Each structure stands twice: as C-alpha cells, then as structure tokens.
C-alpha cells in the first residue's frame, strides 16, 4: 500500500472551514480547530432559526392584522372568522401587508367581513 500524503486534501478542507468562518471575531476566523467548532455551531443556529423564522413572521403578521382590524372595531379572531365566512382566501402575509401599505383595500375587506360577522 503506497503512502498517501494528505497535504492537498487537508489544506482544501481547512480552507473550506476558514472561509466559512469569515467575519467571525477573534481566533474563531483564523485558527482551524476553533473555527471548525464555530462553523459547526453557526450551522446549528442557522438550522434552528430557519424554522423559528416562520413562527416569528407569522406572529408579526398576526400582530399587524390585529392592529389593522382594531382600527376598524374588530378583533383579530372575529376578523379571521369573518374572512372565512365571506370566503375571502387571503393569507396572513398578504393581509398584514395590506393593513400596513394599502389601508383603503384593507378597509374594503374589513367592510365585507363586518357584513358577514353581523
């Protein structure tokens, strides 16, 4: 079995980790052993927070819709129930955007909802 010198592959592996740790502070960005741990942890945080982001944004949309609905005298739950009864199929992302940027259209939807809630 011939001897294998691992200089090329080891250097490539180290380079990959060090480049992934670019922007980290202290020895985390230039010492391989520490950078490897930092990159691993960063990956764990990224994995976790890709899932958390969905929850956080949904909560933000709900808060915005609630604020918009309360301006027109409805609570969030009554507003969403009215949307279902009026068979208006807009998702929370679109509704929250309308509540912030297109108040006229949101008011029109609220009026339709009020007709179905009462």
From Swiss-Prot:
PROSITE patterns: RIBOSOMAL_L20. GO terms for cellular component: ribonucleoprotein complex; ribosome. Transmembrane segments: none annotated. GO terms for biological process: ribosomal large subunit assembly; translation. The keyword Ribosomal protein applies. Keywords: Ribonucleoprotein, Ribosomal protein, RNA-binding, rRNA-binding. GO terms for molecular function: rRNA binding; structural constituent of ribosome. Belongs to the bacterial ribosomal protein bL20 family. Binds directly to 23S ribosomal RNA and is necessary for the in vitro assembly process of the 50S ribosomal subunit. It is not involved in the protein synthesizing functions of that subunit. HAMAP family: Ribosomal_bL20. This is Large ribosomal subunit protein bL20. It comes from Ralstonia pickettii (strain 12J).
């Amino acid at each position: 079995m011939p001897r294998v010198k691992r200089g090329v592959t080891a250097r490539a592996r180290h380079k990959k980790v060090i480049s992934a740790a670019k922007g980290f502070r202290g020895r985390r960005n230039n010492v391989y052993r520490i950078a490897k741990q930092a990159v691993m942890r960063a990956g764990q945080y990224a994995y976790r927070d890709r899932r958390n982001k969905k929850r956080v944004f949904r909560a933000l949309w709900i808060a915005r819709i609630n604020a918009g609905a309360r301006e027109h005298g409805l609570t969030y739950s009554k507003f969403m129930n009215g949307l279902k009864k009026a068979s208006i199929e807009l998702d929370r992302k679109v509704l929250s955007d309308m509540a912030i940027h297109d108040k006229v259209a949101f008011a029109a939807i609220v009026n339709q909802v009020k007709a179905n809630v009462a």
